[in-house]
Amino acid sequence: MRILTLTILVISIFLSCTDMSIPLPKPRVYPKVVYPVKDYQSFSSNNCPFSMMIPKYFIFNQDNNKTENEKQYTCWFDLVCNKLNTNIHMSYVPIDNRADLDEMIQDAFEMVNKHNVKASYRDEIKINIAEKKIYGLVFKIDGPVASPTQFFLTDSTSHFLRGSLYFNDVVNRDSIAPVYDFLELDVSKMIETLEWK
């Protein structure tokens, strides 16, 4: 009897240790994004000597978080899109001479260069809309960077506008790619429709 009980116990232990299920990795999924309808409206502000078309799903927020040296600039603002958890920071600075322009261009490059640590690739696209006196560069930065698109626009004599697209979350380039592509069209539209006053 003892041998029978011991045999049954040993067989039970061996049978209970086998796992017939095969472990499978979980499929990679990303949250579903509900895109707003692409529709644009004219943007113009008394503080800003330019106008452009901006998406209707962006909210204008005046930037009041400036240092003492920056308070003179009244045309700094964010275009916020809560639905896509992103914003475009815009800063306009009037320029009086070539030295001011060179300094602003240098600042724009320094802001872009701060992303080089995490960037895997950077593309610079020249903007030249001579009939509207709009010149500048668009920087497209690939990799887990805070701002994958930055740009600056100028008429090279009195206006300088800088913009940066930010995602308000940890950036996994694969997961934000569809949202990034969606917003790239908006940034392009803003640049194409810019008019100096």
Language model region names:
Residues 13-16:
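C-terminal motif of bacterial Sec signal peptides marking the signal peptidase cleavage site
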Residues 46-106:
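Secretory pathway targeting signatures of secreted, lumenal, and periplasmic proteins
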